[in-house]
């Protein structure tokens, strides 16, 4: 139901019904314990668009508690109104503490493990680019990539069985397990 309601809000945005879209997001925030960062980001921008600066500040802070990085906030031109507002210095002062709070909710050990798996996959993919001939690519795929993939799948299944899907809620959103 969570994702369906988020889609409902996006449909309202597409039909330029911003006030109702924000209301749908607020209902999501009241109903569910875990909220995806993307939903806080969209709701913050909706509140700004509707000139509700207090609500946008509250949503931005909740977004930071959910992993919204300061660099992303600074690079989002739509958030200029917040960054140029009277509360920005206060938000910046709170950022480190709020980000630490977010980081403390993540399984850091598992995050490192998944990041290492991701790096290994990327390295294998890059190495495959250096097998120039079709025959060399086939040989690499058979001798190196297939065994690597089998190990990765086995480790991924172990993670799924023991922890669940290593997504935004469990390990954060800096990289994706693919």
Named regions from a protein language model:
Residues 2-37, 48-176:
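Preference for long, solvent-exposed alpha-helical segments and helix-linker "stalks"
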